[in-house]
Amino acid sequence: REIEYEVHDGIFKAFCDRAGTPIGSGTSADLGIGKSPAIWKVSLEGTGDNPTRTECMQNNHIRIGWDDYGETISDATDYSKDGGRTVLNAFYNRMQIGDIVMSCYSSKTIDAIGVVTGEPEWHDEYQHYKRLRNVQWLVKGINEDIVDFNAGKPMTLSSVYRLSVSVSDAL
């Protein structure tokens, strides 16, 4: 008896297909996705609707906090009081241009998928969540359950972390 497999499009491909109008022109539109992109979960001021999420969607970027550490993060930064070392290391050093970000709307759902297009920046004009990276949103305003996609696990509260999903699984 032979083993049979059903092939299905991945959740990321389905999101992109539903995004509507193609970005760029033709079938070879460059979405800016890197050759070996990591996939990141990003919380925009926590979960649910909020002013930071709305502003980020309108202006094509992601923002995180840890503002009390100031603009410059270095090896000398003392994380003993407020923590944040892992999140800030991910945002500044591990996340790369061309990586994919998924905006966490709840512990089980995402509301947007984008591609990182910029290096980390500090924006003092914001009262909170001053650390920013530019992104190109591929799809916004969705409400997709990704628990199955994320190995059966809900997302955690951490502001930024790499999802343990390969790009081939996502596509």
Describe the role of every protein-language-model region.
Residues 42, 113-114:
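GIY-YIG nuclease signature motif recognition
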Residues 1-31, 145-171:
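C-terminal interaction surface of TIR/SEFIR-family domains
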Residues 1, 109, 115-165:
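Aromatic- and Lys/Arg-enriched surface recognition patch
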Residues 20-90:
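Compositionally biased, charged N-terminal/linker segments
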Residues 94-96:
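Short, well-ordered loop/turn sites that connect or cap secondary structure elements
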